[in-house]
Amino acid sequence: MHQQHTLERAMRRALQLAGNGPAEGVNPRVGCVILSPAGEIIAEGWHRGAGTCHAEVDALARLDPADARGATAVVTLEPCNHTGRTGPCALALIDAGIGRVVYAVADPGPHSSGGGDRLRAAGIDVAGGLLADEVAAFLADWLVSARLGRPFVTVKWASSLDGRAAAADGTSQWITGPAARRDVHERRARADAILVGTGTALADDPSLTARAAD
C-alpha cells in the first residue's frame, strides 16, 4: 500500500497532465498516472478530447502489459462506466489487471458514473476523494454542466470607478487595460461560445473571437 504523500504527489502530477487537454468541448480534462508497487510513476496519460482515448487508456497504452498487473492507477476523475465513441475506462483497467484505483472526484454523469462500483465488483481496491477540492476546482466548469445539465456561464462586466461602462458620447473604445483584455481573451479561448446583447451587437459589431490583447 502506497503512503499518502506518494499518492498525493501522483495525483498532483495527474492534475498537471489533465491541463494538457483541451479546455473546450463536452468532455472533461482528465489525467492519469500509474504507480508501480514501489511507488514509482511508470506511465502517464491524459485525455485529448472527444473521440480520443481517455486518460486511463492512454496511460495503459504506454505501459508493458506485464507491468500493469497489480499496479495502482491514480486518476483525477472516477473512471467512466460508459460506452460511447470509446469503451469504459473501468473495463480497461480491469482487463489490464490493475490492482488499485485512486481517484479524486466522483463522475456525476448519468451515463458515465458507476465506474468505481464496477471496479470494486471486479475485486479491485478503490479509493475516492484524494485531493478532491483541488481537482473539483480545476473541473468546475465541467462539473456544473454534468450535474445541472446546462452550460457553465461566465459573465464579463467592465466598468469605471463611478459605475460607467462607456463614455456618454460613445467615443470610448475600451475602459479596461491590456492585462484585463488579455484575461478576457484567454477566457474566450477556453469557452465554447461567446454571447453579447443586442445593443452591443448593433453598436460595436464585435468580432467575438479569441485573440491576443490589443
Question: What are these model-derived regions, one by one?
Answer:
Residues 33-134:
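Zn2+-dependent cytidine deaminase-like catalytic core
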Residues 66, 144-145, 150-157, 161-214:
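Active-site ligand-binding patch in enzyme domains
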Residues 28-31, 42, 153-155:
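Short loop/turn microsegments at loop-to-beta-strand junctions
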Residues 14, 31, 80, 119, ...:
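Residue-level signal for inorganic ion chemistry
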Residues 10, 34-35, 159:
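Conserved hydrophobic "DFG−1" position in protein kinase catalytic cores
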Residues 23-24, 52, 116, 130-160, ...:
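Proteins enriched for Cys/Gly/acidic motifs involved in redox and nucleic-acid/cofactor modification
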